[in-house]
């Protein structure tokens, strides 16, 4: 008979431990960078689209990296750092934020930040940072601006696991590929 390779989920949404993530369920972010850390060691980054859900996150980029995450989580902790603005380095983002705060000096902090990202995400991040979003922009402290920029460049997400096979788009494993003729899809083992 055929050799069977262990089956596993390959393209599947990622579950998160972060309770605040539920507050941003339904938000889709485009062109962000996701960098996984396995036991504190940086891994290969991925860029693209992410959808936040009530359990964690999904979307093309997340699905594409889920197999790697699944392998990593078997051997330790996995944290994914989100860079919400990968096209801007830290200093360029600082300059952009400073310009927005000056231009809208009488507006509230969360109103100006909502021009850069969805309001629900702004609210969640400011809550994590313990910064009052209703603060007028002219009163935002320098250390708060620095904390906001740092957070926008590295939002930590703590992975609890992958959703099961019932949520997987694709699974891996099954009949060993070396035992199948790809041109005809016939077995090489059983004539």
What are the roles of these predicted feature ranges?
Residues 123-191:
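A glycine-rich dinucleotide-binding beta-alpha-beta segment and adjacent secondary-structure elements
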């Amino acid at each position: 008979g055929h050799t069977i390779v262990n089956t596993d989920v390959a393209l599947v949404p990622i579950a998160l431990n972060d309770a605040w993530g539920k507050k941003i369920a339904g938000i889709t972010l485009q062109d962000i960078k996701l960098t996984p850390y396995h036991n504190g060691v940086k891994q290969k980054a991925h860029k693209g689209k992410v959808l936040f859900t009530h359990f964690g996150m999904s979307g093309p980029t997340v699905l594409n990296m889920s197999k790697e995450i699944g392998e990593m989580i078997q051997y330790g902790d996995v944290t994914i750092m989100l860079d919400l603005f990968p096209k801007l380095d830290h200093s360029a983002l600082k300059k952009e934020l400073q310009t927005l705060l000056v231009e809208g000096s009488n507006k509230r902090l969360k109103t100006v930040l909502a021009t850069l990202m969805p309001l629900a995400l702004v609210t969640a991040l400011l809550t994590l940072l313990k910064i009052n979003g209703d603060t007028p922009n002219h009163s935002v402290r320098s250390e708060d601006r620095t904390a906001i920029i740092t957070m926008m460049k590295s939002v930590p997400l703590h992975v609890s696991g992958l959703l099961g096979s019932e949520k997987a788009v694709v699974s891996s494993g099954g009949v060993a590929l070396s035992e199948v003729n790809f041109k005809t899809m016939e077995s090489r083992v059983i004539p």
